[in-house]
């Protein structure tokens, strides 16, 4: 990172790329609230307009008394009136914010206070420098598609939701497998006995689907991944289909448990035998903003520890042993 005097980080920027900056976060830990306060002060010191949603502004221990230019609005409005939205937390915080922001195509910058941080890729101690780079126009945009899910009974839509990562069919609290059938674009694919099915976007391929044995899919690909959860047949494997595909799932009449459906880990909804679950690409996309130098493969290496090896032992005979002989 180039060396800048601390005071230079907070100077106002002439003709910044973004002027109305939203700030969102969920206070799972004190560090999240602390970072939100620090970023709010940075934005204020740069003479930019800070916009916060009501939930974030009312977080416990968050003190905004020294912030001169702050507007507090409903969360549903923040994407409409902001040029850029900063989300503080982990990837879950960005998943939570995606529903409110995607339809406005407003760029989202994630500051990581979680664990992996595939979506929130800015470290808290780099926030001032990275934000300054972004405001000077040095950034790259990354458009991620979402999924829409509908539970239908006949022509009636019983429940609908959207997901950035995945839609998951699961057995809820039951220990029984689910018996279900799946079609893709009207074609029969299989009847399966398993603990469920993960339907993931490329973004979600590094989340729950990865732990289920699914492939990592580059976020630029137009594809959907179907990952069976503990299938009862060894031949059941993940399937990657076109991003334009429509997946239809029905519960077989021999099923013995109550299947549930969840989008991005939100509260689950039951799927009954007379209903159908439809999953396809959502018309909106979430626009992620990355500071200069973002590299998906580097993120994989770092966050999945691809380059971490056990201590390597030389195959050569130890010189000390040779000397002793």
UniProtKB/Swiss-Prot annotation:
Q: Which Pfam families match?
A: NAD_kinase, NAD_kinase_C
Q: Gene Ontology terms, cellular component aspect?
A: cytoplasm
Q: Where does NAD(+) bind?
A: 91-92, 96, 165-166, 176, 193, 195, 206-211
Q: Which reaction does it catalyse?
A: NAD(+) + ATP = ADP + NADP(+) + H(+)
Q: Where in the cell is it found?
A: Cytoplasm
Active site location: 91
The protein's enzyme class: transferase
InterPro entries given in the database record: ATP-NAD_kinase_N, ATP-NAD_kinase_PpnK-typ_C, NAD/diacylglycerol_kinase_sf, NADK
Q: Which Gene3D superfamilies match?
A: Probable inorganic polyphosphate/atp-NAD kinase, domain 1, Probable inorganic polyphosphate/atp-NAD kinase, domain 2
Family assignment from sequence similarity: Belongs to the NAD kinase family.
Question: What role does this protein play?
Answer: Involved in the regulation of the intracellular balance of NAD and NADP, and is a key enzyme in the biosynthesis of NADP. Catalyzes specifically the phosphorylation on 2'-hydroxyl of the adenosine moiety of NAD to yield NADP.
What is this protein identified as? NAD kinase
The record's gene field reads nadK
């Amino acid at each position: 990172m180039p060396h800048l005097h601390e005071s230079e980080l907070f100077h106002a920027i002439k003709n910044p790329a973004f002027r109305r900056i939203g700030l969102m976060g969920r206070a799972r830990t004190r560090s999240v609230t602390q970072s939100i306060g620090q970023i709010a002060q940075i934005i204020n010191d740069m003479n930019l307009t800070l916009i916060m949603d009501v939930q974030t502004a009312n977080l416990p221990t968050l003190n905004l008394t020294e912030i001169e230019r702050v507007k507090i609005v409903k969360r549903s409005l923040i994407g409409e009136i902001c040029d850029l939205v900063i989300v503080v937390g982990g990837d879950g915080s960005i998943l939570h914010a995606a529903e409110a922001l995607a339809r406005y195509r407003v760029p989202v910058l994630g500051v990581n206070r979680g664990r992996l941080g595939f979506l929130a890729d800015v470290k808290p101690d780099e926030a001032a420098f990275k934000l300054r780079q972004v405001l000077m126009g040095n950034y790259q945009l990354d458009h991620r598609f979402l999924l829409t899910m509908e539970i239908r009974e006949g022509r009636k839509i019983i429940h609908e939701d959207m997901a950035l990562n995945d839609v998951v069919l699961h057995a809820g609290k039951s220990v029984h497998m689910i018996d279900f059938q799946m079609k893709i674009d009207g074609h029969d694919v299989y009847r399966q006995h398993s603990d469920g099915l993960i339907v993931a976007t490329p973004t979600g391929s590094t989340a729950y689907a990865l732990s289920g044995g699914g492939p990592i899919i580059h976020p630029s690909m137009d594809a959907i991944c179907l990952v069976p959860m503990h299938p009862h047949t060894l031949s059941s494997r993940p399937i990657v289909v076109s991003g334009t595909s429509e997946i239809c799932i029905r519960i077989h009449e021999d099923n013995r448990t109550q299947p549930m459906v969840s989008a991005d880990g939100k509260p689950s909804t039951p799927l009954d035998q007379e209903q159908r679950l439809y999953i396809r690409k959502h018309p909106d996309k979430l626009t992620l903003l990355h500071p200069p130098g973002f590299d998906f493969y580097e993120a994989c290496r770092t966050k999945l520890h691809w380059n971490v090896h056990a201590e390597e032992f030389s195959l050569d005979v130890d010189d000390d042993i040779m000397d002793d002989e």
